[in-house]
Amino acid sequence: GFKDWIKGAAKKLIKTVASAIANQ
């Protein structure tokens, strides 16, 4: 459902941000 999509998108966003911070 929509909530599951939001959860997935949030996890992806967190992973992306974490990777960006780690690569600095």
Curated annotation (Swiss-Prot):
Q: Name one GO cellular component term.
A: extracellular region
Q: Name one GO biological process term.
A: defense response to Gram-negative bacterium
- Reading the lineage from the top rank, the first entry is Eukaryota
Q: Which UniProt keywords apply?
A: Amphibian defense peptide, Antibiotic, Antimicrobial, Secreted
What does the tissue specificity note say?
Expressed by the skin glands.
Q: Where in the cell is it found?
A: Secreted
Q: What is its main location?
A: secreted
Say which family it is in.
Answer: Belongs to the ascaphin family.
Q: What is the purpose of this protein?
A: Antimicrobial peptide that shows higher potency against Gram-negative bacteria than against Gram-positive bacteria. Has a very week hemolytic activity.
Q: From the Swiss-Prot or TrEMBL record, give the protein name.
A: Ascaphin-7
**Which species is the source of this protein?**
Ascaphus truei
